[in-house]
Amino acid sequence: CLARCSHPNIVKHVLSMDLDGMLLIVMEYADGGDLYKQIKARQPGMKYFKEHEILFIFLPLCLALDHIHGKRMMHRDLKTANVLLTCTGLVKLGDFGFSRQYEDSLSKPVGSTFCGTPYYLSPELWRRAPYSKKSEMWALGGVLYEVMALKRPFGGKNMDELIDNI
């Protein structure tokens, strides 16, 4: 899916090749790390992002998702670790390993594979319902919450507690 995307807020696909049965993908390098690490670095002193900083992070992410949705694709693993940053402050959506093309109707499910990162999965995914655009929006809301609060919206001592909290 990444090869079909060309947007300033999506990591660029440079090259794909098969090397002895292994798929190698070369992508643009985001030299500023990822959003998860930026959040972790702010946690000790609770150095919250200012409102304009949140906007500069969240708006490009929304534009990237709008672009891939416009191409009838879904990311399916939206999380702060997959929001990459450049040293100049650009936000880039990366890691399209779980992304899938969807049918003409957004109401239809997208793939039958259970995938994603537990903290960002919507309640219906935990009930093993198929992935849909609603699930993608749930994860987007989780990312926004994490940027604003410097912590994930849901947690737990173990997976069962996390699922109950979601």
Regions found by a protein language model. Give the residues of each.
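Protein kinase catalytic-loop region centered on the HRD/HxD motif
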Residues: 63-73
